[in-house]
Regions:
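Glycine-rich phosphate/cofactor-binding loops in nucleotide/flavin-utilizing enzymes
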Residues: 87-105, 192-247
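Glycine-rich beta->alpha junctions and the first turn(s) of the following alpha-helix
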Residues: 50-150, 220
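Short Ser/Thr-interspersed hydrophobic loop/turn segments at strand-loop and sheet-helix junctions
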Residues: 26-27, 42-48, 71-74, 94, ...
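Buried hydrophobic positions in well-ordered alpha/beta secondary-structure cores of metabolic enzymes
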Residues: 6-8, 24, 41, 69, ...
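Tryptophan-centric aromatic hotspots in well-structured domains and transmembrane helices
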Residues: 12, 21-23, 40, 64-68, ...
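A short core secondary-structure module
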Residues: 2-3, 7-53
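C-terminal helix-coil-helix/basic helical segment that borders enzyme active sites and/or dimer interfaces
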Residues: 120, 124-133, 147-203
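Cytochrome P450 C-terminal beta-domain/meander region
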Residues: 1-7, 164, 199-207
Length: 247
């Protein structure tokens, strides 16, 4: 017929509890290689065979989910690309996603400015913490990284505009943004000292803004492909190094 019956489970699906449709990558034939025989569907999430279970993060928020498919139905009309050609579609989606994540360099620059303001407001012995040489050194290092990420993003975006589609360079953008964001919010907690451990109404600075973003930043190094995957991609496809021995 014109429909596919799908069973399986997917963990860490972002915002599935809001979605009417989700990209689904499913195996539809054996294939000669592990990435062959895969098809990409645009799955209807509002059908009886789809169950979405929440995953509550350590910051108390609910962004991620487990999705269970029990005889879920997908139709030929919901296939993206061709049957058994889903790997190519998936790679294209990931490249677009990583380029989109890389665009967070602009918010990273704003967050750095907020971090500097925090360092000006936090005092130690009535002296702003930003006056300490080691703090200024760490802030300078973060500034260099954020500016480097921004310039690299502009370079990769320029190439993308020329060729008409995102490339593997998106892994660089994604890696830089994820790791720099985590480092920035870790520095914010460090600057606050023991007050950085306070939560919500007890937080002295920003009503837990820094604490919540610090906790969430760890997930940013996982979602959209872990930092380790990005490093392997950069090493193999940009630097031309040998493949990961574990593959």
């Amino acid at each position: 017929g014109d429909k596919w019956i799908i069973n399986g489970q997917k963990v860490w699906t972002s915002f599935a509890h809001f979605a009417d449709r989700c990209f689904l990558v499913a195996r539809t034939s054996k294939g000669e290689k592990k990435h062959h025989g895969i098809t990409c569907f645009l799955l209807d999430m509002n059908q009886p065979g789809v169950e979405v279970r929440p995953i509550i993060q350590m910051d108390g928020e609910h962004d991620f989910n487990e999705v269970y498919l029990n005889d879920a139905v997908a139709y030929d009309s919901e296939i993206i690309g061709a049957v058994d050609d889903g790997w190519r579609v998936t790679i294209a989606l990931l490249m677009h996603e990583r380029t989109g994540i890389g665009a967070q360099v602009f918010s990273l620059e704003q967050q750095f400015n907020e971090l500097v303001e925090l360092a000006q407001n936090v005092t130690e012995d009535n002296v702003p913490i930003i006056e300490k040489a080691d703090v200024r050194k760490r802030l300078l290092n973060l500034y260099i990284k954020s500016r480097g990420s921004l310039l690299n993003y502009y370079r990769n975006l320029t190439k993308q505009l020329k060729v008409g589609h995102p490339g593997v360079e998106g892994s660089m953008d994604k890696l830089f943004v994820s790791e720099n964001t985590k480092e920035l919010f870790a520095e914010a907690i460090s600057i606050q000292g023991h007050q950085g451990l306070l939560w919500k109404k007890d937080a002295i600075y920003g009503d837990s803004y820094w604490q919540k973003n610090y906790l969430y930043s760890f997930g940013q190094t996982i979602g959209g492909g872990t930092s380790e995957i990005q490093k392997n991609t950069i090493a193999e496809r940009i630097l031309g190094l040998p493949k990961d021995i574990g593959k």
